Amino acid sequence: MTKDILILAVETSCDETSVSFIKNGRDILSNTVLSQIESHKRFGGVVPEVASRHHVEGITTTINEALVDADVSIEDIDAIAVTEGPGLIGALLIGVNAAKALAFAYDKPLIPVHHIAGHIYANHIEEPLTFPLIALIVSGGHTELVYMKDHLSFEVIGETRDDAVGEAYDKVARTIGLNYPGGPQVDRLAAEGEDTYSFPRVWLDKDSYDFSFSGLKSAVINQLHNQRQKNIPIIEANVATSFQNSVVEVLTFKAIQACKEYGVQRLIVAGGVASNKGLRQSLADQCKVNDIQLTIPSPKLCTDNAAMIGVAGHYLYQQGRFADLALNGHSNIDLEEYSAE
């Protein structure tokens, strides 16, 4: 009989303090998330210093709550997985140091996890990953297309050349006058409007899987500025719809084309923007037409959480990819360099 593998996972890369216990790479025994949205809302975005202070205040309580929810003890675990980057360095260090302290105190292996690898493996909780596949990464800091031929094998075939898609959403939301976090607000508003603006679709070079959203973002900002200068009424829902349609069309087209070119029948979506209803519907429609299997995590697993770190950590554990107590946080880590040999 195969022994169960129990991973304690810690995630503090941005503005959520999260701790999870994952059994055998898919079973979530607990996934505690302490959100900081209300604290950052008055600033219109995440303030790194504020985020770090909240992590310091909440990490111990979050660990204890996750332990109670999972009904396990730390002595039962096989290893401790923690996000080492990319992310806000101050925030990362809180989680890394907490994980190192536990690893030292309980003599457990320490597993460093790439934050984007975690987002990818959130899909494995919904449905086991089958390879090869294409992963579309859409978040506040990343927009990438990744080809995977096996577990922990990452080949970045496309990425943003300027703004990440989530960053563009937040800036457009602020220009419209919506509250933080802007992405979900734009998505909700887009469902009520009509596509009345001819905002650009940026395709870049022929056959390129790279993205660019700065031009689209600027077009929206300039359009609203000009209308306000001329006292022309603005229908915010129409702005949101037109902007979102431009974004979704490009993301969907490039993801489907990548699947076709690489000969894969599996597309997964990862990152906070994967919660976007417009994007989810567009991908579902086009995957159905092209006979591609689509997996998108439930919204609660799209945003930052420790469960996804624990799932990725499970496969790193199986490969024996451990760190010593000199582990540090890193604001930038290349996903391909992190890839298994």
Curated annotation (Swiss-Prot):
It is found in: Cytoplasm. It comes from the Bacteria. It catalyses: L-threonylcarbamoyladenylate + adenosine(37) in tRNA = N(6)-L-threonylcarbamoyladenosine(37) in tRNA + AMP + H(+). Transmembrane segments: none annotated. The keyword Plastid does not apply. One of its GO terms (molecular function) is iron ion binding. Substrate binds at residues 137-141, 170, 183, 187, 276. GO terms for cellular component: cytoplasm. SUPFAM superfamilies: Actin-like ATPase domain. Its EC number is 2.3.1.234. Its main location: cytoplasm. Its cofactor is Fe(2+). GO terms for biological process: tRNA threonylcarbamoyladenosine modification. Fe cation binds at residues 115, 119, 304. Keywords: Acyltransferase, Cytoplasm, Iron, Metal-binding, Transferase, tRNA processing. Binds 1 Fe(2+) ion per subunit. NCBIfam families: gcp_kae1, T6A_TsaD_YgjD. Required for the formation of a threonylcarbamoyl group on adenosine at position 37 (t(6)A37) in tRNAs that read codons beginning with adenine. Is involved in the transfer of the threonylcarbamoyl moiety of threonylcarbamoyl-AMP (TC-AMP) to the N6 group of A37, together with TsaE and TsaB. TsaD likely plays a direct catalytic role in this reaction. PANTHER family: TRNA N6-ADENOSINE THREONYLCARBAMOYLTRANSFERASE (PTHR11735), TRNA N6-ADENOSINE THREONYLCARBAMOYLTRANSFERASE, MITOCHONDRIAL (PTHR11735:SF6). Belongs to the KAE1 / TsaD family. This is tRNA N6-adenosine threonylcarbamoyltransferase. It comes from Staphylococcus aureus (strain MSSA476). The lineage of its organism: Bacteria, Bacillati, Bacillota, Bacilli, Bacillales. The gene is tsaD.
